[in-house]
Amino acid sequence: MAKISGRRPGRAATRLAAAAITAALVATGASAAFAAEPGDAPLFGLSGVDASGNAYTYAPQGDGTLSARVKIDSGWTGLAFVGQVDNNADNIADGRWQLGTAGNIYYYEGNSPAKKIGYGWDTYNTVVSVGQFGGGEGGDLLTRDDKGDVYLYLGYGDGTVTKRLKVGYGWDIYTQIAGNGDLDGDGKNDLVARDKSGVLWLYKGTGDQKAPYAKRTKIGSGWNQYNNLFAAGDLNMDGRTDLVARNEKGELYLYAGTGNAAAPYKAKALIGTSGWNTYRLFF
């Protein structure tokens, strides 16, 4: 396979990646079961890119655990971000965005060739696929630059996005930002952010593109024990959005969603005993 390294891989790589993720979901029955319940949390499974550029995916088993990994592709080097996106609100990923370290961002869907949707994105130190966050037609992207300014790109539903909208500032206080789904049961997608002292905060979504999130509320402290927080959609197939967290030892924990803003996550559950620090990106 052609290496990515800031440029797009060929159609074969795109097709293989989509097929591998779909196959992993179908093999567990997850795709069909979840597709019958539209309007719940996204069912994306969990995928990762390791330091060598190999990409793997894990399907949810329905109890919070994950299947054995399936290799998607190789040569995924030079990437700063990969994010899955659901563009038609059926809770299944339709495609993915990939941002190269050179600042070019592409969209991939099915057998279609890669679509370049932007450039100059190396100005951002964080990019998050947040789902339908600002009332757009498709999934949106949230970004943060080195100054701490936050921008929202509304999705058109075909992988392309609008011009950016500045929706916040001062977010350089956070070391992790995650979100792709509804955490409080109001039907609007939310965000979580961890500050430098290890406190995790909830930003409830409003659905308003000009002010897409409400004032933050505290979830809890001690979250600096993790080096990666990622919102992978619904991993235990209960219809609620979950969070995965990895620590320095390479252990992976599931924080299952509750749908309650006052306590949006259940107690952590160990779902990966070791080896998860091989991944430098989750998507």
Language model: regions and residue ranges:
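Trp/Gly-enriched beta-strand/coil motifs that build multi-repeat beta-propeller-like domains
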Residues: 2-283
